[in-house]
A protein has these predicted regions:
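The conserved acidic donor/metal-binding loop of glycosyltransferases
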Residues: 132-136
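Hydrophobic targeting segments
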Residues: 7-12, 24, 44, 52-58
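C-terminal catalytic/acceptor-binding lobe
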Residues: 189-303
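Active-site-proximal specificity loops/subdomain of glycosyltransferases
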Residues: 20-26, 58-127
């Protein structure tokens, strides 16, 4: 039987996701790009299977952002194949009511996929792997994903366990989530992937926790990912309840991070003060000042 042709995207939703309308200012963006370059890119360069494209997604507003332009130019100097789109977030955003979220996703897919069609080319299937901008995959992950999705009985695949790393200190521990983590891949027929309504109908996933509710989901009970913490995460911190036993830093060789070093980010007085508080208090303050106050002011300015 002839092997099916695939296009494999590792999709990084850089802006458009989370608090503050998905963009927390240029200082945040500079720091996140630093994390991306120092940790995520080495892990991608270390992949044993090179047949993939890094798809970096942005809001339309970032098309002319000098930090985004610099990152795009820098990536073009690396061996990685990459493409940037500016159509917004290309999976379900559960901050909105279902009808609004579905409409926004359809629009974002339409705007983004039109820039992917030439890159996709003449293939049978498109694989879409979620690649967060501050987390990493093991160096055999792409090969493992592609091999697993040759099976006809599954159309999605993910890893159930991983590691968690404090990028600032270099500490690494096991990471044992009790729900499906956001490290999964969906296998689309090309014709379905490129049509927004069919795309959404095929994979109506409102959260990574529910992938198995909608797709024939295969999982690997191995530690295939590394969650990175750096002090600017929205929901994950090093002493998370899912954190397990400490592990030796030798494990970083499995992720291409043996030479990554530790992360040095400038910390404002406001953040120093915030970090003195319990994490739950920090999240509540971010929500109140970010979502309830700044976002309303931002929307007022745009109206």
């Amino acid at each position: 039987m002839e092997e099916k042709k695939i296009k494999h995207f590792l999709y990084t939703p850089f802006t458009g996701l989370g608090l503050y309308g998905g963009f927390r200012g240029n200082r945040w963006l500079r720091n996140r790009i630093k994390v991306f370059k120092q940790f995520v890119i080495p892990s991608l360069l270390a992949q044993t299977e090179k047949n993939f494209t890094l798809w970096v997604g942005w809001r339309p507003e970032e098309r002319s952002n000098p930090h985004v332009i610099e990152l795009k130019n820098w990536l073009e100097t690396t061996p990685l194949k990459s493409i940037f789109t500016y159509g917004g977030l290309c999976f379900w955003d559960d901050k909105f009511p279902d009808d609004v979220a579905k409409s926004r996703l359809a629009t974002n897919l339409h705007l983004s996929i039109r820039d992917l069609v030439d890159e996709i080319g003449d293939v049978d299937y498109v694989l879409m792997t979620i690649q967060p901008s501050d987390d990493c995959y093991a160096s055999n992950a792409v090969a493992t994903i592609q091999d697993a999705l040759k099976r006809e009985d599954i159309n999605a695949f993910g890893f159930t366990k991983g590691y968690i790393m404090n990028y600032a200190t270099g500490e690494v521990s096991e990471y044992n989530p009790n729900t499906n983590p956001p490290f999964y891949t969906i296998k689309f027929k090309k014709s379905v992937f490129i049509e927004p309504q069919e795309h959404i109908q095929f994979a109506p996933i409102k959260s990574h926790e529910y992938v198995a509710n909608h797709l024939r989901y295969g999982v690997l009970d191995e530690r295939g990912f590394l969650v990175g913490t750096h002090g600017e995460n929205v929901s994950t911190y090093y002493n998370h309840p899912f954190k397990g036993n400490w592990v030796d830093k030798e494990i970083l060789w499995n992720f291409g991070l043996q030479n990554a070093g530790t992360l040095k980010l400038p910390i404002s007085l406001r953040k120093r003060f915030m970090r003195m508080m319990p994490y739950r208090v920090q999240r509540k303050l971010r929500y109140w000042f970010g979502e309830l106050i700044w976002n309303r002011f931002y929307e007022y300015l745009r109206s």
